């Protein structure tokens, strides 16, 4: 059997990444050019700055990924690219580069949903067992997804307002923490106690929707009022209390989803899946079903996860033509108009 190599491109936000996947789940390279330092002074991602950085480094990422993998363009079987959701300018840079590379090398083009990439990052660790439930938690998304078979995604619950990662960054900014704040809040939370009361929105309601705007507002109001009155707040306890509220919500909704759908596995993925507090709670409270969380290096945005998702689409011969365009608000159940089913 001839080995299959997929080159994947990811540029949906502030990471430029190119990866090479061998066959189903062996990552030969996963080059990531991070822009975090460029965005820190702004306290968040500036879309125009992100796009310019992508343009500056993407060619080098292609070269480095191929060199690290020890293959050439002639060895490749396909090119995969994130076409949404994400920042439209950032997406267009990766999309243009991937399309040009695929066209120049006569390779099929595989369109990949960014969130499907996060979910399928777990495939690098072990084969996924279907049907499964996925909890996807990142800076832009908080979703519960039912996956009856590979590549078939059904959103069964999502946030009505802020994503969980967005809430972390916003309260981190209020506390004067460095962007992105999730890791620092997690570390501080482990040193503190859950002493401040924060709301757990919709935690007892029967549906599978999330809401974090009320929690974020309650945190900001507490911090603001204490500052106005000259009251001292204990940073570690603030972080522990905020994180306890977040994790209570995530665990409650995930347990409800598992009780309603015939899942054989739970996948937890996305940037917030790197949170040690979340990992600890999952290990303690969900023991009746196997829980798979990608390795830390695959939790954030990276092209390796896009390649792992693309392998599923390659098996189905789901290719796109060169009219493929960026879809910044792409949903799980959307497919490109330019799909060519062979």
Swiss-Prot record:
Cofactor: Fe(2+)
Main location: cytoplasm
Example of a GO cellular component annotation carried by this entry: cytoplasm
Domain of life: Bacteria
Record key words, sorted: Acyltransferase, Cytoplasm, Iron, Metal-binding, Transferase, tRNA processing
Record: residues binding substrate: 136-140, 169, 182, 186, 275
Cofactor binding summary note: Binds 1 Fe(2+) ion per subunit.
InterPro entries in alphabetical order: ATPase_NBD, Gcp-like_dom, KAE1/TsaD, TsaD
Keyword Iron tagged: yes
Catalytic activity: L-threonylcarbamoyladenylate + adenosine(37) in tRNA = N(6)-L-threonylcarbamoyladenosine(37) in tRNA + AMP + H(+)
Subcellular location: Cytoplasm
Family: Belongs to the KAE1 / TsaD family.
Protein name: tRNA N6-adenosine threonylcarbamoyltransferase
Organism: Streptococcus pyogenes serotype M4 (strain MGAS10750)
Taxonomic lineage: Bacteria, Bacillati, Bacillota, Bacilli, Lactobacillales
Gene it is expressed from: tsaD
């Amino acid at each position: 059997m001839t080995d299959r190599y997929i080159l994947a491109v990811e540029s949906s936000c502030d990471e430029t990444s190119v990866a090479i996947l061998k066959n189903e789940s062996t990552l030969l390279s996963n080059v990531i050019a991070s822009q975090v330092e460029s965005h820190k002074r702004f306290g968040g991602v500036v879309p125009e700055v992100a796009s310019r950085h992508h343009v500056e480094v993407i060619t080098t990422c292609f070269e480095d990924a191929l060199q690290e993998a020890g293959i050439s363009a002639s060895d490749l079987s396909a090119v995969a690219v994130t076409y949404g959701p994400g920042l439209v300018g950032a997406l267009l840079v990766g999309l243009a580069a991937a399309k040009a590379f695929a066209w120049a090398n006569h390779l099929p083009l595989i369109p990949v949903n960014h969130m499907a990439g996060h979910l399928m990052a777990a495939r690098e660790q072990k084969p996924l067992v279907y049907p499964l439930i996925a909890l996807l938690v990142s800076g832009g998304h908080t979703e519960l997804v039912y996956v009856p078979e590979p590549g078939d995604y059904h959103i069964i619950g999502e946030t009505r307002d802020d994503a969980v990662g967005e809430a972390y960054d916003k309260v981190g900014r209020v506390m004067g923490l460095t962007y992105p704040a999730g890791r620092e809040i997690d570390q501080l939370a482990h040193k503190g106690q859950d002493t401040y009361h924060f709301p757990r929105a919709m935690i007892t309601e029967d549906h599978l929707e999330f809401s974090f705007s009320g929690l974020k507002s309650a945190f900001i109001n507490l911090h603001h009022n204490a500052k106005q009155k000259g009251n001292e707040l204990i940073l570690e306890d603030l972080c522990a209390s905020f994180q306890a509220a977040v994790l209570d919500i995530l665990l409650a909704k995930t347990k409800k989803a598992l009780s309603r759908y015939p899942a054989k596995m739970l996948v937890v993925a996305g940037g917030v899946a790197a949170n040690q507090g979340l990992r600890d709670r999952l290990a303690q409270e969900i023991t009746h079903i196997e829980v798979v969380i990608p390795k830390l290096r695959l939790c954030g945005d990276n092209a390796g996860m896009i390649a792992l998702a693309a392998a599923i689409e390659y098996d189905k011969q789901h290719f796109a033509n060169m009219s493929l365009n960026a879809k910044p608000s792409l949903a799980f159940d959307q497919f490109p108009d330019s799909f060519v089913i062979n």
